[in-house]
Amino acid sequence: MKRIAKAHWNGTLQEGTGEISTQSTVLNQTQYSFKTRFADGIGTNPEELIAGAHAGCFSMALSATLAHHNITAGDIFTTATVDLDMQALSITGIHLDLQASVIEGVDEATFTEIADGAKTHCIISKALNVPITLSVVYA
């Protein structure tokens, strides 16, 4: 299986603009620029897309890992925060904030252990060479 995304960029780094499109067309010539990446411009940016991909992948991996333990997942809400070091121009880490509804028969310690395993086995986690941290709110 292959997934495809395309990017087009025109102009200098600070004044130029670009568009990102995905095979599914969920992103279809979606605007990105220096301002959307490093300021508050309208559009997306590569780091935001990584965060979205990681949050989605982790949530699915957690659901699958819970099912592997014969546990049905309740609501899973994940926020991924990508840390960008502007001096080094590199991503230095990603933090996953997980909020999940109480699942009958699973205590918080077991759930946290399962979530940590899902973090490790998530396909996007495996693709990234940065520290990935996790905090869990199990209510």
Region annotations inferred by a language model:
Residues 1-52, 59-139:
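Extended beta-strand/beta-hairpin segments
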